[in-house]
């Protein structure tokens, strides 16, 4: 594995949030000027390689991998299909965690679920059910997420306060946080659907 592959792998897993030169330097141990050179090389490689669907962009202080604009029509078909289809169990689980714990970071969601949530969270942002509501004042300035008005419309809620109150869970409970969020969330959504 070469140095640029390490940087590329970090860009990939950073997803839509992107990653800063400082973070790339911290994770890889390479100096910032070396990181900038690698990013420049990657950007040029993506530009000249007609067989890749990706390109590297910089927005603000972060770098991210995105799809090339000429692929927009095929991606619109994909996301249009997904927007009409139901939500996966993972998407419902993430939505319920965001709804009850907002504002919340992706890392906090991952910790509650015990698995990586980046791709599903990104799809929820694209579907306008979740949005970035701010950034934490800590290293890396991670984004915080919250629900949208579209989320309320999608589930027939007038206000986020209409979600059911979570029961207190004792230490001896078999339910973990993510199970509890999802159970309560689904119970509320089933109730709403029966009333329609």
Curated annotation (Swiss-Prot):
<dbReference type="GO" id="GO:0051301">
    <property type="term" value="P:cell division"/>
</dbReference>
<dbReference type="InterPro" id="IPR036390">
    <property type="entry name" value="WH_DNA-bd_sf"/>
</dbReference>
<keyword id="KW-0131">Cell cycle</keyword>
<dbReference type="InterPro" id="IPR036388">
    <property type="entry name" value="WH-like_DNA-bd_sf"/>
</dbReference>
<dbReference type="InterPro" id="IPR005234">
    <property type="entry name" value="ScpB_csome_segregation"/>
</dbReference>
<dbReference type="GO" id="GO:0005737">
    <property type="term" value="C:cytoplasm"/>
</dbReference>
<comment type="similarity">
    <text>Belongs to the ScpB family.</text>
</comment>
<comment type="subunit">
    <text>Homodimer. Homodimerization may be required to stabilize the binding of ScpA to the Smc head domains. Component of a cohesin-like complex composed of ScpA, ScpB and the Smc homodimer, in which ScpA and ScpB bind to the head domain of Smc. The presence of the three proteins is required for the association of the complex with DNA.</text>
</comment>
<comment type="function">
    <text>Participates in chromosomal partition during cell division. May act via the formation of a condensin-like complex containing Smc and ScpA that pull DNA away from mid-cell into both cell halves.</text>
</comment>
<keyword id="KW-0963">Cytoplasm</keyword>
<dbReference type="Pfam" id="PF04079">
    <property type="entry name" value="SMC_ScpB"/>
</dbReference>
<dbReference type="GO" id="GO:0006260">
    <property type="term" value="P:DNA replication"/>
</dbReference>
<protein>
    <recommendedName>
        <fullName>Segregation and condensation protein B</fullName>
    </recommendedName>
</protein>
<keyword id="KW-0132">Cell division</keyword>
<keyword id="KW-0159">Chromosome partition</keyword>
<dbReference type="GO" id="GO:0051304">
    <property type="term" value="P:chromosome separation"/>
</dbReference>
């Amino acid at each position: 594995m070469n140095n640029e592959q390490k940087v590329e792998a970090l860009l990939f897993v950073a997803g839509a949030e992107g990653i800063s030169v400082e973070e790339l330097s911290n994770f890889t141990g390479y100096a910032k000027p070396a990181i900038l050179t690698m990013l420049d090389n990657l950007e040029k490689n993506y530009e000249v390689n007609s067989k890749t669907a990706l390109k590297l962009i910089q927005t603000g202080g972060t770098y991210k991998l995105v799809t090339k604009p000429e692929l927009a029509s095929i991606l619109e078909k994909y996301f249009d299909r997904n927007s009409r289809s139901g939500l996966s169990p993972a998407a419902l689980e993430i939505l319920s965690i965001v709804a009850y714990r907002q504002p919340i970071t992706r890392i906090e969601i991952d910790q509650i679920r015990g698995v990586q949530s980046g791709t599903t969270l990104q799809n929820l942002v694209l579907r306008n059910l979740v949005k970035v509501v701010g950034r934490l004042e800590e290293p890396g300035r991670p984004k915080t997420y919250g629900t949208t008005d579209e989320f309320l419309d999608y589930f027939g809620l007038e206000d986020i306060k209409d979600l059911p109150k979570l029961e207190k869970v004792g230490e001896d409970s078999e339910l973990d946080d993510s199970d509890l969020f999802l159970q309560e969330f689904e119970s509320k959504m089933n109730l709403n659907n029966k009333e329609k």
